[in-house]
């Protein structure tokens, strides 16, 4: 099976920033950095940029694509709810697709940001593709559930979005490796952007490996966050610096 491992290097000092939501949350989110090249989402499809259900209004504001992930900022508003107790992250259950057909697979995605007033939360969401994104396109998102108070409260509804994105290739590159590390693990390629490092691997069936990444000085990139998806074998690691 194939595997994807993504690491976020905190390179904020070296990165290219737009105002509004990205500027307000970029230093505190998991995939930190400066999003100057983020694009205000055009109003051509205004009806697909805002959705309301169960008393919660969600509005997409900006989008940025580094070549592997699409980062979208959202504003969550609800007059009858208090977001001040939610900390810096709200989890939502989503289905999303980079093609015309919506995926039927549910994914828990974090809205990473902050509460700006009692009834308004702003944050950034990160959507990953299975491989490197080579062309501009449209990300389709369906939010099914909003989880509050550490998933103690679930609000089910339907919030649908169509987000056009542009691939920014500056500072991003894919490096072919094609190296077998041992009898059951090979590294196919590595994708590097200002926001993350993605390692594409191939593992033989039934065997799972632990992977460590090192910078150019031989220093190990530390891990803060690990997420695993066993079939399709996706692993994500959060790094503190390279």
Give the label of every model feature segment.
Residues 5-242:
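Alpha-helical, hydrophobic structural elements that either
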């Amino acid at each position: 099976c194939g595997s994807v491992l993504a690491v976020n290097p905190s390179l904020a000092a070296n990165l290219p920033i737009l105002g509004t939501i990205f500027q307000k949350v970029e230093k505190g989110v998991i995939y930190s950095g400066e999003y100057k090249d983020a694009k205000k989402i055009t109003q051509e499809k205004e009806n697909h940029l805002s959705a309301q259900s169960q008393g919660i209004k969600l509005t997409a504001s900006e989008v940025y694509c580094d070549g592997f992930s699409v980062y979208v900022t959202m504003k969550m508003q609800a007059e009858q709810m208090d977001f001040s107790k939610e900390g810096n992250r709200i989890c939502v259950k989503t289905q999303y697709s980079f093609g015309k057909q919506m995926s039927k697979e549910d994914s828990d995605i974090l809205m990473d940001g902050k509460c700006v007033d009692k009834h308004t939360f702003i944050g950034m969401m990160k959507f990953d593709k299975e491989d490197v994104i080579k062309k501009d396109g449209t990300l389709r998102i369906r939010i099914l559930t909003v989880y509050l108070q550490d998933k103690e409260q679930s609000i089910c509804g339907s919030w649908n979005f169509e987000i056009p994105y542009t691939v920014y290739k500056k500072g991003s590159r894919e490096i072919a490796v094609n190296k077998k590390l041992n009898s059951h693990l090979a590294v196919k390629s590595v994708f590097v952007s200002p926001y993350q490092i993605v390692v594409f691997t191939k593992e033989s069936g039934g065997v799972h490996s632990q992977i460590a990444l090192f910078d150019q000085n031989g220093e190990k990139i530390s891990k803060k966050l690990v997420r695993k998806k066993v079939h399709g074998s996706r692993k994500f690691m959060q790094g503190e610096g390279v």
